[in-house]
Amino acid sequence: MLEEPECGAPGARGEAAAMDCKDRPAFPVKKLIQARLPFKRLNLVPKEKIDDGLDDTGGSRAGPVQTQLHNLETSLDHLENCHMGSDIDFRPKLVNGKGPLDNFLRSQVETSIGQAVVIIDLTEDSSNPPDNMVGHNKLNSAASSAQKNINGVPDKAGDDRGLPKARQKDELASPEEALSEVPCKTEAGGADSGGADRRGLTQRGSPQNCPKLTGDLSMWSEKDRDGWSEAGGILFKGKMPVVVLQDILALRPPARSPPATPPSQAVPSESETPESSPEEDLALSHSSLSSSSPTSSPEGQSVPTKLHTGPSPFPASTPVCRITKKLVRGSAEKNKMKLQRDKERLRRQLKLRAEKEEKEKLREEAKRAKEEARKKREEEKELKEKERREKREKDEKEKAEKQRLKEERRKERQEALEAKLEEKRKKEEEKRLREEEKRIKAEKAEITRFFQKPKTPQAPKTLAGSCGKFAPFEIKEHMVLAPRCRTAFDQDLCDQLDQLLQQQSSEFSFLQDLKSRRPLRSGPTVVSNRNTDLSNSDVVIVESSKVDGVPERRKFGRMKLLQFSENHRPAYWGTWNKKTTVIRPRDPWAQDRDLLDYEVDSDEEWEEEEPGESLSHSEGDDDDDVGEDEDEDDGFFVPHGYLSEDEGVTEECADPENHKVRQKLKAKEWDEFLAKGKRFRILQPVKIGCIWAADKDGGADLKVLQQFTACLLETVPPEEEQTPKASKREKRDQQILAQLLPLLHGNVNGSKVIIREFQECCRRGLLSRDAGSPEDSAASPPSPGPARPQTPTASEDVAVPSKARLKRIISENSVYEKRPDFRMCWYVHPQVLKSFAQEHLPVPCQWSYVTAVPSATREDSGSVPAPGPGQGMPVSLKRKSAGSMCITQFMKKRRHDGQVGTGDLDDFQADTEEEDDDEGDCVIMDISDVGDIQAPCGTTSGAGGSVGMDTSESFVSPSSLRLS
């Protein structure tokens, strides 16, 4: 890039001025050309990118490129000012280091004033030098046209090239504008205040101050512009920017002499010149970089030099800046070195930028690769998880399918097996039923062979015709259908009815007609035998039911079942021939007190019988008495399950098929039992003669009779009936509760033990009506043997309460729980104790038991004495209904003082071995003489009579003594 020498005017590179401007003669003396070395464009990148790179790498270059370009134009403008306004004495003495050589140069410049300025474009190749003046004229014309555009003269060529004014206004000021704004005169104070101006803040002035710069410019012709172009104030030849140099010696100085320049503003020495070189080179490098971009902003555009091709209006002299060859050569070398340094710096910056971009690119690529790898891993993981899930679902489905198929096969096999078993079972059942029917028929024939029944004539069966939607009605023997119309049809009545329907008279009252009418009457339906076939033509007569084969059924009537679901007592199945006149269909809830006693609750008096012992021990017994008579008697035994269907017991399962199967199984078991040879023993009468008191050999007979000893309860006089019969039950409950309180309160045993103990005490007469506990008279309870029982009565008060009644009284008046006083035991309610004045009862209770209690409970109570040797284990003498017993059926017996020896009882036989349970059904009484009434039982009376019981003629078996 070429640049004209600068003078000492204020500017960005004002310190680097190494020349002094002087007035020269009008004639040209010598051509003086200052040029810079050609440069090579380093990078053809847009201006914005170069500026950004420079701003990033070189932080010290704070000034914009536009300011440097303005400074360059300002320096050129100052140079022109120096040409026009310099006023220096041309004396041979040294002024600022200038001597006679300067005068010689001045004289050479004056002689060559009329010569044209030669323009050398160092940016072009060395093979194309400007050897003629055509290029010079063209450049001058271009420069003049650019200057005219700046000063307001319209540029036709610019308009023809399509550069609108609006674009020129929008852009920043071009280099020509910067040159026009610089004032032509330099002031002395410009150097002092040039600090800010040299950094880019240039002084501005009107373009009229420099008429020489604007008036001598000329326009290029269109024909001379081949290969040249202008964009943004920069000249291009082809694609290369061109800098136009002006001959600084051809310009005439102005008429007036310039003010004296102080020595500080003169041409600097060689030592000062290198200091200004970096800024100058920096500005040049910036302008060189920005000149390659035609579309860059005006800040980075290179500044073309103003050219003056016309003759100078001042012919007298031309200002000349003296530049020594040494200074020019040193400046060129320094500029070259600076240019190289700039290139190296720019290369390093570009390299650093490229490395940074490469690193950033590598980092982005690494990050992208990492993200892609992560996504790929996630996709692979999801794919694997999906495959695993699908595989697991598939396995589960296969497993479920296999299980289903296996279950289906198992069900098929099970169904096939069940079908086979069912078929086999049906065959066996059919076979067994046939055998059962045969056996039952044989038994019935055996039973009913003694009773010959007259054969009743069988009613004829008539089959009725079709009766439409209704099925045929089955009619049995001695049954006829009622006639459809019992009265004869009267035509007069029919006509009267039709007349009334047609008239619809409101005077006639149907209510009055109903009151006046008499109901029709008709006798029983009697159908003659001759009309039987006609009237019963649509009736099917089935076979009459068979008459029950049970004898004397007609005499006693039909069997009846009385059963209630809330009762514990089994249902009643039997005959009921009593009739009442109180209970009628119109009054079904009436009470016939003459027939029934509504105060007695038979359900409470009922007691469950103890389960019998097993008969398995009698399997090995030898039966020597089995003979032909047993075979004959077997026919009279009713088989198990026979005539027991729906009798007395409510079946849990209402399925009739299961019920029949159950009955068949029971019958089969009964058949097997009979097939094994098991037979019931026939009861043999036992004859026991008189037993004398002195007879010691009668111990066995005495022991047998002693089992039926009667125990008489205390006779209680009946209370006066002041309350109705409805309160008798409540009074009895209160009496039982008063006697039960000492045993119940604080007792650790269960309700069964308490009930058994209380019943035993009641049987022995140990409980008095007035006494609340048996401690008063039964501190050591006597055994039932030596005690003299009192004669019982048939009153309800002396009867032994039932288990259900005692259990209800216990549950209503006490609770079994654990309290702080004692552990788990029975506690009577406080209000009950208070009502009976028994709050002082101890816990645990201090009752003396007469029955056996569990060992653990006996130890826990701590107050139960061990039974003495004379007391022994009491024999259970339970009675089911003592009030209904007849004591006259028992006979008197007497015992002596000695102990009865054990004898052989093999000759006494019974149907079962439940003697302990059934021996309470009978009572043996000791009836002494009149004089021995007060004597205890078992002592020898003074009369010494012999008392015996003769059972040879009339034997009373234990079964006959059973009371129900």
From Swiss-Prot:
Region (Binds to PCNA) residue spans: 1-49
Segments forming a coiled coil: 329-453
PTM sites of type Phosphoserine: S126, S141, S144, S312, S773, S783, S811, S876, S881, S959
Main subcellular localisation: nucleus
GO annotations of cellular component type: CAF-1 complex; nucleus
UniProt region (Binds to CBX1 chromo shadow domain), positions on chain: 1-316
Pfam families from the UniProt entry: CAF1-p150_C2, CAF1-p150_N, CAF1A_acidic, CAF1A_dimeriz
Protein name: Chromatin assembly factor 1 subunit A
Annotated source species: Bos taurus (Bovine)
Gene name tied to this protein: CHAF1A
